[in-house]
Design a protein with these regions (language model features):
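Alpha-helical bundle regulatory/interaction domains
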Residues: 1-198, 208-213, 227-248
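Residues within the DNA-recognition helix of helix-turn-helix
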Residues: 204
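Short, basic, alpha-helical segments at the C-terminal edge of helix-turn-helix-like DNA-binding modules
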Residues: 217-227
């Protein structure tokens, strides 16, 4: 993998949206010249959903498992899309310069605000116009027409905040850690509705997040291993056995 001087930015949500928005990202390659390998985007397994705008340029998603090579099969996506949770890594490619803007949403928050079936979005990228009502489509238009990314962040927060305040569960957890979030979802699933059996709770988790509790636990463990490894690298003492034990792998 090669790197470039392209602009990449990350915004964390305000505290009132912490249990709804995972983060906001922008990628802008309009001012740099990238070679073929640098125009591939490698996205990891993700429990989140995403609102994705291609403000300039295009994106083509490679077939699952295809290597980042010119002959690999690929398909273009719309300029404005909803990405569901992904259970596998995803590779995409930009034919030329691009400017993309992405809002990562917790899947249960998206379901509460829109009524969408998150499970039906698993491993899918869908044009926004096919799934959202007029209010949400108006947001997509406003974000696309904004002057800069800071304005886009402000538009998204102003749109989401009243909707999340109205629809959020009373026990939604203000945490950016996947382990904390998945435990909060499991607790709400176990105490919601008339039926409180284990099977019914698991069905609610799948309905709200698109994934099983076991998968969410595994993603949380992977995230913790990443943070443990990053801290160990910063401290100059990486001991993989200790990292595995601290992350629940040993």
């Amino acid at each position: 993998m090669t790197y470039s001087d392209a602009r990449s930015e990350l915004w964390l949500p305000r505290s009132a949206l912490a249990s709804c928005v995972r983060g906001v990202m922008a990628r802008d390659t309009l001012s740099v010249v990238l070679d073929e390998p640098q125009r591939y985007n490698h996205m990891p397994v993700a429990p989140t959903c995403a609102l994705l705008w291609y403000l300039r340029g295009e994106c083509q998603v490679l077939a699952p498992g295809a290597p980042p090579l010119p002959h690999s099969p690929r398909a273009p996506i719309a300029a404005a899309t909803l990405c569901g949770p992904f259970t596998r890594p995803t590779v995409s490619w930009n034919p030329g310069p691009m400017h993309a803007f992405m809002v990562l949403l917790m899947p249960d928050a998206l379901a509460h605000m829109t009524g969408l079936d998150t499970a039906a979005l698993l491993d899918r990228i869908v044009p926004a116009e096919e799934v959202f009502d007029a209010d949400w489509q108006a947001l997509f238009t406003q974000v696309a027409q904004a002057d800069n990314d800071d304005q886009r962040v402000a538009l998204v927060e102003a749109f989401l905040l009243p909707r999340w305040q109205q629809s959020r569960p009373a026990s939604a957890l203000h945490s950016h850690r996947l382990t904390d979030w998945s435990r909060s979802v499991a607790l709400r699933a176990a105490s919601s509705g008339l039926g409180r059996s284990l099977r019914q709770a698991e069905r609610r988790i799948k309905q709200w997040t698109g994934q099983t509790q076991r998968n969410l636990h595994g993603l949380g463990r992977s995230e913790r291993a990443f943070f443990e490894g990053a801290q160990a690298h910063q401290d100059g003492a990486v001991h993989w056995g200790d990292i595995a034990q601290a992350s629940g792998y040993a």
